Amino acid sequence: MAFPGFGGNTQQLVIDASSSNLKVAVGTYNAKTGNVYLEKVGIVPLESDTISDGAITDQFGVVMALKHALAKLDITQKSTIVTVEGAFMHTRDLELPAVKPEQLKDMVKYEILGQSTNRDMIVEYIITGKTLDEETKGEKYKVRATAVPVDVATDYKELLKGADLQPYAMDVNPNAVRKLFSSGMINGSVNVSNSTLLLIELSSNTTTITVLDKGFPVLTRRMQFGHKNLRQVAENVKKTQGGGDKQSSLARRLNITKSDAETAIPVEEIDVWHESLADEPSLQSAANSYFKNLTDSVSRTAQFTINKYHIDSISSCFLYGSGAGYKKIDKELSRQLGTQVEVLHTMSTVQGPKNFIISEFVNCCGALIREN
């Protein structure tokens, strides 16, 4: 999905602007092999609420942070893809008559915007399959459509221009995830094409659960809770104990570009295994609250999807996002859910620089994939 108003090149800078930190990567997509190649990656911490639920609230602050980070990372690529996600997005699955492209486009817009009070929206769609009408036996398209307000797209376009970048395309994270996980092997052992999986993005303020059935996301749910409070409580505990005064190996590997962030407690030093929290009641309480929200959301989403879409039972869960770095989070979540849980470490379709941590750059990788 590429929204109009943006325009083209081969190697791209891609920015994931959906969370409290910007994720940036430079790379290419080879359509023949289906592989993504990343040359440089980095994370740009932002001041609190500079981007709120995917919407820019402090354009100047983001521009300054982005320009500083790109200079420090020695990224000179100008052609830029940005991928976003927020409550402003509206996505629907539709079944529409198999008509000509222009007619289908009008039908999709009517279905998406017909009941909306905001008609100033950009609407894009993909055809995900075909079916037959039960009554007429006529052919119908299965369509997934997404609408984003024009002013959101305009804000990001102006942001890129303010950072001396050239807008190329705009994507949305669910679409980026769809493209990235359409095929390939996860962690060297799970074939996406013949598995039913849960992908769980653990962000600071949100949690996104995607049910992936044989390479297609049948359902995506984004919840308004994240690991921010758990991180803050852990930092307070560590600082009380006199820790947190040196840059972590993870911060170096991720190329975090802000000196303030380099002194923060890295998540890989925060152990969330239940036995490790016995002597830290405040951290234990924060972890219990977070895992309760997480397990309840995962269980409800999985059960709803199995009942509604009649898919196979879910075989594995894979964690990505900033929260996937917590020590033993996969082990603890597996214990509570009673199913296999792994952190996303590798994908056969993605190659990155040395010590590349794919779990932080999933949306960037998917957004690099351009479909014509």
Where would I find each of the regions flagged by the language model?
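Active-site neighborhood for divalent-cation/phosphate handling
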Residues: 79, 83-185, 348-350
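Adenine-nucleotide phosphate-binding core of ATP-dependent small-molecule kinases
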Residues: 236-241, 245, 249-314
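N-terminal phosphate-binding loop and adjacent alpha-helix
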Residues: 40-71, 279, 283-286, 290, ...
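Glycine-rich phosphate-binding/hydrolytic loop that grips phosphoryl groups
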Residues: 176-179, 184, 324, 342-372
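Glycine-rich phosphate-binding loops at beta-strand->alpha-helix junctions
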Residues: 313-339
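Gly/Thr-rich phosphate-binding beta-strand-loop-beta motif of the actin/hexokinase/Hsp70
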Residues: 2-44, 80-85, 186-223, 227-229, ...
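Phosphate-interacting basic helix/loop segments used at nucleotide- and nucleic-acid interfaces
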Residues: 63-73, 184-195, 300-302
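Glycine-rich beta-strand-to-loop/alpha-helix junction loops that act as flexible
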Residues: 82-86, 317-324, 344
